[in-house]
Amino acid sequence: MAMKIRCNDQIIVLTGKDKGKRTKIKKILKNGKVILEGVNLVKKHQKPVPAQNQPGGIIEKEAPIDFSNVAIFNEDTGKADRIGFKYENGKKVRFFKSSGKAIAKINKS
């Protein structure tokens, strides 16, 4: 199945402790999970690594969340939405299923 969401898409979390939070996709993993900015934070107990000049301690990092637990956020309706594909002028374009409006391309930065 093709991933309909992409990096830097504005999304909303559907389930879990961060339900309802709006954020962006930071990274998409190959196992069907995504890493979101500032969501699903876990604390990792890190040992110091003097060879790499890395201090030890408790580090907060973003853990992956399954992509079925997130949905793209439609700013026109203010709700989560589904995505479809259609061809416009010979190019494949993503669009919101509720409104039919094309999703603007986001530059990677």
From Swiss-Prot:
GO cellular component, one term: cytosol
Matches recorded under SUPFAM superfamilies: Translation proteins SH3-like domain
Residue ranges that the Swiss-Prot or TrEMBL entry lists as coiled coil: none
MF terms (GO), sorted A to Z: rRNA binding; structural constituent of ribosome
Biological processes per GO annotation: translation
Keywords on record: Ribonucleoprotein, Ribosomal protein, RNA-binding, rRNA-binding
NCBIfam families assigned to the protein according to its UniProt record, in alphabetical order: rplX_bact
Subunit organization: Part of the 50S ribosomal subunit.
Function field: One of two assembly initiator proteins, it binds directly to the 5'-end of the 23S rRNA, where it nucleates assembly of the 50S subunit. One of the proteins that surrounds the polypeptide exit tunnel on the outside of the subunit.
Protein family according to the UniProt entry: Belongs to the universal ribosomal protein uL24 family.
Protein name as it appears in the record: Large ribosomal subunit protein uL24
Species of provenance: Hamiltonella defensa subsp. Acyrthosiphon pisum (strain 5AT)
Gene: rplX
